């Protein structure tokens, strides 16, 4: 038969399930290519490099040299003291939005628009700092790509270390 999603299959006694056939590998490669075409690929400088599930799967299934075709051009939102949102790296998996709503009971982030125009957002015209975000970072912890990351203070620390008017213990 055809390919059936594991999450929709009803288990049956004696059923044989194959999860690593040539057909499935080819199907997964196709999905990964589509995801990567809609994803701004700057893996070498991405904070998630080495921890990115999309990067892991691309390596695992031999998907390389995919050029972004039409990635989201929404601006990066670094207004929050804790979390940075880069919508161009979002694969619309929904892990962050479910975590924010269901685990934290906050709903600071969600998807807006429909179809190819769908983007991760805090609402039209709003930034994360304008929401009821508690800066818990759970959304970033759940994000499989670099769409949500914990804000780094490395630049501020280096500025302080290199400031001749300050005494800094390292």
Where are these regions (language model features)?
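Fe-S ferredoxin-like electron-transfer domains
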Residues: 2-135, 141, 148-168
């Amino acid at each position: 038969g055809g390919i059936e999603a594991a999450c929709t299959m009803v288990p049956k006694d004696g059923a044989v399930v194959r999860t690593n056939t040539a057909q499935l590998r080819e199907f997964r490669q196709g999905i990964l290519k589509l995801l990567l075409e809609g994803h701004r690929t700057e893996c070498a400088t991405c904070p998630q490099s080495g921890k990115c599930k999309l990067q892991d799967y691309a390596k695992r299934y031999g998907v390389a040299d995919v050029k972004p075709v039409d990635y989201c051009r929404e601006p990066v939102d670094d207004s929050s003291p804790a979390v940075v949102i880069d919508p161009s790296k979002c694969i619309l998996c929904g892990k962050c939005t479910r975590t924010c709503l269901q685990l934290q009971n906050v709903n600071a982030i969600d998807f807006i628009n429909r179809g190819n125009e769908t983007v991760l957002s805090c609402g039209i015209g709003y930034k994360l700092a304008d929401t009821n975000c508690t800066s818990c970072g759970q959304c970033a912890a759940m994000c499989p790509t670099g769409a949500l990351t914990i804000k780094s203070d490395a630049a501020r620390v280096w500025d302080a270390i290199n400031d001749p008017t300050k005494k800094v213990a390292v």
